[in-house]
Amino acid sequence: SGKRIENGLIEVPMGATLREIIFDIGGGMKNGKKFKAVQIGGPSGGCLITDNLDLPLDFDSLKKVGAMIGSGGLVVMDEDTCMVEVARFFMHFTQNESCGKCVPCREGTKRMLEILERIVNGNGRDGDIELLLELADTISSTALCGLGKSAAMPVVSTIKNFRSEYEAHIYDKKCPSGNCKKLITYQI
């Protein structure tokens, strides 16, 4: 799904590349927009970038770049997508799905969501990126189930691949893609 020409359900052999799926089978990006990222593996999967388009889709290759096959779903994003908002969106979903049994997942995802919401609303603080990464490490290493262990993957992968977007939100109070409403300023 996402911002490509053809969306739908396809079946490809293990080892197919993201480039084959997005551009050959999916027809490329809508409206001539530039590919920015693809989120793979369901709500707790990682976000991959152009450098990963020729990566074979298999368990080991994806694990090396901080992603997973998971449900096999792909969400394709173009240049107009705010990656901080993407991380917030998936953390919101994961936090809602937490059963609450273990503290790292229940409280850690709640705290990560609070920080991400603060950032997209223009109230990010110095140290938020490091705090997100610290919480992600704690949650992934101490949670009891697969959801908790992978909950922070979208946040970690977007920080790794789009750190400058987080920094623009926090320090410049700007959303480079122009999507975060609280960070849009108007002049007359």
What is the predicted function of each stretch?
Residues 1-188:
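Redox cofactor-anchoring modules in respiratory/redox and cofactor-processing assemblies
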